[in-house]
Amino acid sequence: MKVRASVKKRSPECKIVRRKGRLYVINKKNPRFKQRQG
């Protein structure tokens, strides 16, 4: 999980999800792309 100031979709499989007021990027196919907005 990377914490970034700005989160972007790094592949077409990435999904942007809002949980508890934070933005997350999740990717089932390639979990390396997981991110959270700091």
UniProtKB/Swiss-Prot annotation:
Entry GO CC: ribonucleoprotein complex; ribosome
Single Gene Ontology BP annotation: translation
SUPFAM superfamilies listed in its UniProt record: Ribosomal protein L36
Superkingdom, taxonomy of origin: Bacteria
PROSITE patterns: RIBOSOMAL_L36 (PS00828)
GO molecular function: structural constituent of ribosome
Keywords from the named record: Ribonucleoprotein, Ribosomal protein
Record family assignment: Belongs to the bacterial ribosomal protein bL36 family.
NCBIfam families attached to this UniProt entry: PRK00831.1, rpmJ_bact
Descriptive protein name: Large ribosomal subunit protein bL36
